[in-house]
UniProtKB/Swiss-Prot annotation:
It is a multi-pass membrane protein. This is NADH-ubiquinone oxidoreductase chain 4L. Core subunit of the mitochondrial membrane respiratory chain NADH dehydrogenase (Complex I) which catalyzes electron transfer from NADH through the respiratory chain, using ubiquinone as an electron acceptor. Part of the enzyme membrane arm which is embedded in the lipid bilayer and involved in proton translocation. One of its GO terms (molecular function) is NADH dehydrogenase (ubiquinone) activity. It is an enzyme of class 7 (translocase). Core subunit of respiratory chain NADH dehydrogenase (Complex I) which is composed of 45 different subunits. InterPro entries: NADH_UbQ_OxRdtase_chain4L/K (IPR001133), NUOK/Mnh_C1-like (IPR039428). Pfam families: Oxidored_q2.
């Protein structure tokens, strides 16, 4: 396995570990999710370019669109929670408190 792939897999694993460790704040969770999506985007682009699989050329672009939608929804949720509660704790997102 080339060193580039190992570095991208390690970046994904570090972002996943950060998501699992720092899950109390919504902003840190969103940053870790963005790191995971970025590493998935780079990995899928490299795999498609190296295998010359032309039918899957749209897959990284679709992944990037989903990452942008996820970021927009996450930031709007962050603004809503911080305006309502004054903090960005994930525990404020409990649906049973409605």
């Amino acid at each position: 396995m080339p060193l580039v792939y190992m570095n991208i897999i390690m970046a994904f694993a570090i972002a996943l570990a950060g998501l699992l460790m720092y899950r109390s704040h919504l902003m840190s969770s969103l940053l870790c999710l963005e790191g995971m999506m970025l590493s998935l985007f780079i990995m899928s682009t490299l795999i498609i370019l190296n295998t010359h699989f032309t039918l899957a050329n749209m897959m990284p672009i679709i992944l990037l669109v989903f990452a942008a939608c996820e970021a927009a929804l996450g930031l709007s949720l962050l603004v809503m929670v911080s305006n309502t509660y004054g903090t960005d704790y994930v525990q404020n997102l409990n649906l049973l408190q409605c």
